[in-house]
């Protein structure tokens, strides 16, 4: 007879097989399970802002800037209908955004009528500071969702290659970006970039000047940003043959799912943005009623509803406030020496977004890079206050958090489906190896019919970890 110990071992083996593997996220104090649980707490709060609030569901952006820092003549524009962005006319612009235009950082009225202030020295991205309203467009982020557009090929690859090459750091006090010639990338020709999507996490093979904590964080943010976008595209994929929007599991596995480091970096980016919201919550707790933070709308009722929804989001995030220890970054003198270089290179990525040939991709690229830049400003610049952020930065931060939240949720569902497919493929391979025709074909057919049964089994076993 089988002993109790043997039965327990068998049960543990079966149980471990049914569970999705837990990922310990380096440079954080959490895991994939912790991220799933944090996500479940704010899942219903984020859409209140990003879909129903005029303040957070709209965005003002210089979308059609003519200059591109990568190449002089850029005619590789996406002609697909899915690449187009629907902008707002003057009548459609929400009142809250019309009012915000009166409180630009360059406006003297900002000092007395609104508590928004602006310090460009702390920026981790280029913000649109033009005083000409003709250079901006207002867009509804709800009406222009991030999804598959068909924009791909050599031009898209060149954009990503240029972004990856920004992880070349040089500690040079005389390094002036304005004096660097405009070439095919915003880096010096003799700088050799690292491969952000390397499958080897062992930094011991790198020189000490390269294998520092901050450079790895830079790499992970860009890697997670790319993996998150790929996940959104796979989650909202247009099947040309069937003429419908669907999910593309095979493409997700090829782009993201087959690379554990990319999945981990999605979770890392969630942790980074979550910690930025915690930082905001910490500051809001210290704001007195006499100098309360407002969103500067014309309608006090709208202001109250927006403030309440935003406050609920950041305070729920505050419940899990020890996710990333921001004091670990730029802690020693060597790291502090290239902090300006770190900021400059991340800022250059926001300029690369002007070269994207797809309008909708450019829009969401600008929004999300601004969101990550805002998170870095809050976490890496201790003097940054909530009142130092521009409205576009706060909106970008919340919408980027919404995007990474969708990526985390989609990663869970894609992983369940991938595990179901792998299990059935393994069973069918065993059948084909054990039985002969026609028995093996018949058995394999019946196994295919159990897909939803296995999927439900994996779901039941794993869903308590994400609730």
Curated annotation (Swiss-Prot):
SUPFAM superfamilies: ERO1-like. Its cofactor is FAD. FAD binds at residues 147, 149, 160, 223, 226, 255. It is found in: Endoplasmic reticulum membrane. It is a peripheral membrane protein. May function both as a monomer and a homodimer. Belongs to the EROs family. This is ERO1-like protein 1.
């Amino acid at each position: 007879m089988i002993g109790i110990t043997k039965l327990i071992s068998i049960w543990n083996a079966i149980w471990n097989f049914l569970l999705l593997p837990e990922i310990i996220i380096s440079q954080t104090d959490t895991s994939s399970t912790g991220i799933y649980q944090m996500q479940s707490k704010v899942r219903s709060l984020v859409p209140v802002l990003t879909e129903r609030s005029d303040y957070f569901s709209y965005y003002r952006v210089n979308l059609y800037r003519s200059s591109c820092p990568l190449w002089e003549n850029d005619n590789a524009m996406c002609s697909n209908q899915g690449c187009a962005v629907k902008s707002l006319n003057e009548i459609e612009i929400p009142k809250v955004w019309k009012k915000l235009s009166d409180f630009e950082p360059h406006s003297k009225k900002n000092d007395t009528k609104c508590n928004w202030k602006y310090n460009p020295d702390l920026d981790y991205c280029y913000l649109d500071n033009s005083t000409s309203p003709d250079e901006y467009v207002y867009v509804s982020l709800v009406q222009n969702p991030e999804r598959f557009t068909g924009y791909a090929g050599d031009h898209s690859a060149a954009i990503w290659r240029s972004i990856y090459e920004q992880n070349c750091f040089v500690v040079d006090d005389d390094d002036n970006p304005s004096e660097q010639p405009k070439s095919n990338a915003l880096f010096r020709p003799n700088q050799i970039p690292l491969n952000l999507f390397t499958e080897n996490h062992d930094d011991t093979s790198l020189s000490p000047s390269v294998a520092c904590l901050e450079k790895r964080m830079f790499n992970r943010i860009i890697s997670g940003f790319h993996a998150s976008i790929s996940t959104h595209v796979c989650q909202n994929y247009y099947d040309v043959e069937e003429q419908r929007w669907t999910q593309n599991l095979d493409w997700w596995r090829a782009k993201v799912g087959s690379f554990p480091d990319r999945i981990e970096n999605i979770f890392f980016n969630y942790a980074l943005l979550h910690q930025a919201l915690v930082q905001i919550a910490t500051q809001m707790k210290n704001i007195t009623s006499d100098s309360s933070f407002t969103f500067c709308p014309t309608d006090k009722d709208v202001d109250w509803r927006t403030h309440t929804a935003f406050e609920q989001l950041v305070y729920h995030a505050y419940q899990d406030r020890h996710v990333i220890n921001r004091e670990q970054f730029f802690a020693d003198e060597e790291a502090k020496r290239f902090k300006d270089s770190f900021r400059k290179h991340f800022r250059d990525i926001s300029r690369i977004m002007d070269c994207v040939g797809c309008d909708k991709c450019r829009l969401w690229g600008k929004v999300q890079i601004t969101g990550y830049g805002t998170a870095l400003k809050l976490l890496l610049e201790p003097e940054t206050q909530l009142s130092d952020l521009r409205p576009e930065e706060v909106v970008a931060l919340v919408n980027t958090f919404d995007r990474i939240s969708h990526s985390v949720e989609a990663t869970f569902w894609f992983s369940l489906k991938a595990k179901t497919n792998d299990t059935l493929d393994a069973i069918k391979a065993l059948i084909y190896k054990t039985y002969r025709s026609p028995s093996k074909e018949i058995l394999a057919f019946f196994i295919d019919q159990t897909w939803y049964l296995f999927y439900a089994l994996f779901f039941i076993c794993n869903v308590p970890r994400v609730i």
